[in-house]
Amino acid sequence: MGAPSVGDVVVIPFPYSDLSQSKRRPALVLAEAGRGDFLLCQITSKQYGDLHALPLKESDFLSGGIKRDSFIRGTKLFTANEALILGVAGHLTHSKLSEVVSQLIDILSACLKDDTF
């Protein structure tokens, strides 16, 4: 498999937040981080009460797709090496990718509004 592209939805062993285990999950490629590493964002079928979770539907894919409507969780990011990527499930439309990036900017900008920073 070749290197993934920004906007690809890949399948990867995604770690639980306590790093005790991992589960095969789709993840969105947000950026190339150099040396074969990529910044990824978790995609899950459950919203988990996450106020930042963006809905992901079949119509949000330019090509390919995933089995069910899901959520992109902008607060669940991690860096993974290309060797961990098990495959590419699809590629998002430009408009959906733009929505995700805009939301990430909002999430990260919120810390600048905090007087303790």
Sequence positions of predicted segments:
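Compact nucleic-acid interaction/catalytic patches
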Residues: S20-K23, V29-L62
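C-terminal terminal-subdomain/extension
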Residues: S63-F117
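Small/flexible residues
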Residues: P26-A27, T75
